[in-house]
Amino acid sequence: MTATPEVQKSIEEVYTKLQGASDCSSLLKKHLTKDVVAKNKSKKTRLGATLLDVIQSGGENLDSGVGIYAPDAESYTLFADLFNPVIEEYHNGFKATDTQPAMDLGEKNVGELADLDPEGKFIVSTRIRCGRSLQGYPFNPCLSETNYKMMETRMKEIFNSITDPELKGTYYPLTGMDEETKKKLIADHFLFKEGDRFLKAANANRYWPNGRGIFHNEKKTFLVWVNEEDHLRIISMQNGGNVGEVLARLIKGLNLVAAKAPFARHPRLGWLTFCPTNLGTTVRASVHIKLPKISAKDDFKKICSDMKLQIRGIHGEHSESKEGIYDISNKQRLGLTEYQAVRQMYDGLKKLIELEKAAA
């Protein structure tokens, strides 16, 4: 299978645009060389994805940090000339010869994660999430409307079968959602919107809102987003800083879903996701935290970066901090175990809280 001449021309146009954009510093621009374009512009995956599907978001959004997405699982292998160097640079030197370790969620280690902030002075809330792709389905740009609906039906059956009192709850499909339910989910910060301009340009919003929905338990501490950026985002959260409790609930919920729906895993890259930044463990362990003193210092970002922590505003990626509250998470997802990813966040935050106390 070969990409059409029109697609190949569009790929060359994206390359030319990126090279001429002095204000663009994405990993796509850096690693989409003339040689990579020449070698890969005619290739097509079995599901019909081309290099254009991989690069179009970064070509349209010159302020992207990374700029590439995988339209299907095969893309990670077929377009490895581009994915491998981007993955290596983003994921802390994870080379093309490296392999993601076997899964270790940390069942035996949960007890080591004592509450980071028992007095409740700093941490507003704690959240751990992971992404999963259902085996046998492509990612967003290659999904048909039928695919979306089939995946949603499968997940509804799983949700309806949950008997664990901590996890059982209700599934809310986005299709046909009434205003009252919508308002309630927005108030709880559970409702995800149509993808932003980065995802839109990557063709991740097709057939919206079909096949999309949200499941949450009665206590609103366990959530599953269906067909947002990834097929599944499995989330455990609660107020305060008890990371151990949050992780234990995530493990229980993830194991429950995994027993009934096999997930797509790559022998080298681990759990597969639409965006290469989430590969491997896919784990993002985060807190909303008040750090008014050290966040005012010039080297705050460097302190976090040195501890492999990522800072965002509390309204997610590409948002600013409000009232000195930051969303701080582990940056590394690949080349370490799931438990190590959580531990990276935990140990870094312990240190940040010590620094904040010392600055008082």
Swiss-Prot record:
Keywords: ATP-binding, Kinase, Nucleotide-binding, Transferase
Residues reported in the UniProt entry to bind ATP: 125-129, 189, 233, 284-288, 312-317, 327
Domain Phosphagen kinase C-terminal as annotated: residue spans: 122-359
InterPro entries xrefs: ATP-guanido_PTrfase (IPR000749), ATP-guanido_PTrfase_AS (IPR022415), ATP-guanido_PTrfase_cat (IPR022414), ATP-guanido_PTrfase_N (IPR022413), ATP-guanido_PTrfase_N_sf (IPR036802), Gln_synth/guanido_kin_cat_dom (IPR014746)
EC identifiers of the protein: 2.7.3.3
Domain Phosphagen kinase N-terminal: 10-92
One annotated GO molecular function: ATP binding
Pfam families per UniProt: ATP-gua_Ptrans, ATP-gua_PtransN
GO annotation, biological process: phosphocreatine biosynthetic process
Domain of life according to the entry: Eukaryota
Binding site for substrate: G65, V66, G67, I68, Y69, E229, C275, E317
GO CC terms, sorted: extracellular space
Reactions mediated catalytically: L-arginine + ATP = N(omega)-phospho-L-arginine + ADP + H(+)
PANTHER family reported for this sequence: ARGININE KINASE ZC434.8-RELATED, ARGININE OR CREATINE KINASE
Protein family: Belongs to the ATP:guanido phosphotransferase family.
Protein name: Probable arginine kinase ZC434.8
Species the sequence originates in: Caenorhabditis elegans
Organism ancestry: Eukaryota, Metazoa, Ecdysozoa, Nematoda, Chromadorea
